[in-house]
């Protein structure tokens, strides 16, 4: 068991980020409620770009680097990164998926027949899998890591075990993000 002893770091969870979560959810609700196609599309594209870009960066750039980094460097990166992703990633995934559904309804994609509806079904399947993976695994791991890093003697072996699975899950998420880009470009060019 590897432990690092230092001063008690205090709370690393940045609770004030909940204001940003509330603001993002409010913008989403407004975009859906006023049924403005441009605003709904903007919120969907913006949140989807954030979700996709961060997933791809984390899964294919940062993950491999951290797996090879010194344990103290990994700890510091996790202490800085985890609190930021704790609220950001669930929020962008919820906003992207929800606005995507309402956008599909507003554009008539949900009324398509087969085989065209297969593209809609593929998008729904991918978003559902990514959201379940994100909210059901990645977010809890983020919470566990945050709580462990707040301890004076954080168990880095335990954290490394969680983070190993975390980065594999993020790489899986990134692969699904690439698949959904294929589906979205099909929507954009016409089904």
Where are these regions (language model features)?
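Polytopic transmembrane helical bundles with strong interfacial aromatic enrichment
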Residues: 1-191
